[in-house]
């Protein structure tokens, strides 16, 4: 994990063709890798001083790139072309052949995941596509300092159907920490943050973890979908156990229940699928199931400025940031 992470891959003076005048103009170009501050992109400034003070600049996000190539010398000397899948392109010329090669190499490595000196004339690497897909499914986040962990900084977040993982930004194979989705108490987001509260069953123990990211909404939706699936699986198992208990009770046989899945450690996530309602939670009593009712936890509503103070009182300290939470009770 990098607390002093630098997202600048390469920068320098180049010449970019003006769309209005059709002539090449000199500017300062900065290539930044994907991070918690934003996606992979090119930032164009009038000069180096403007880049230092972060003055007005134009940004080109590097998504859906089809190819990155060098242009023939007769077309434009020391030129690099970025070709997108929609057949549009962006071309710039460097001040030397060495600079052009450097720009092309870094762009290919970051945007296409390849190295110029890699020669793959034999059979295709069947694992490469899967590895690349897994890398693309990770989100760039910045873990804010917290007393529960001795690490913080830039990293990548992966969300599976059961867990949340943090991976090292420099070595994608190094796992930093893991939280089971079933042990989260609540989670929320806004446009630049994602946060969740872990329960005591997690390796980190109880605590609030906050991440700075431009992909807070996407992370939230993926976590929420996974927790819904866990809740539905839990509900299906409870129904199967109830039916089996009733059948064995009617046959006056001893009841033996096998646990087919690992149930969420947090107590009853039914509120995720049915918010602001009361539902039945079955508990095993003797050889059968007796049903008792208990109020489900409330899913925190989205922040609204016009809310009264009384409506905001149930929210926790972290909700003052404007996050919309989904919550569950921890046993």
Swiss-Prot record:
What tissue specificity does the UniProt entry give? Highly expressed in fetal and adult brain. Highly expressed in the cerebellum. Weak expression in kidney, spinal cord and testis.
Q: Which GO terms describe its cellular component?
A: cytoplasm; cytosol
Highest rank taxon of the organism? Eukaryota
Q: Where is this region: Disordered?
A: 293-331
The task this protein performs is described as: DOK proteins are enzymatically inert adaptor or scaffolding proteins. They provide a docking platform for the assembly of multimolecular signaling complexes. DOK6 promotes Ret-mediated neurite growth. May have a role in brain development and/or maintenance.
Post-translational note:
On Ret activation, phosphorylated on one or more C-terminal tyrosine residues by an Src family kinase.
Which family would the database say this protein is a member of?
Answer: Belongs to the DOK family. Type B subfamily.
GO terms (BP aspect): cell surface receptor protein tyrosine kinase signaling pathway
Q: Cross-referenced Gene3D superfamilies, in alphabetical order?
A: Pleckstrin-homology domain (PH domain)/Phosphotyrosine-binding domain (PTB)
Locate the PH domain: which residues?
Answer: 8-112
Give start and end of each IRS-type PTB domain.
Answer: 132-237
Q: What is this protein called?
A: Docking protein 6
The UniProt keyword set, sorted, is: Phosphoprotein
Please list the residue ranges that the record marks as compositionally biased, kind Low complexity: 316-331
Indicate the quaternary assembly: Interacts via its PTB domain with phosphorylated RET.
Q: What is known of its domains?
A: PTB domain mediates receptor interaction.
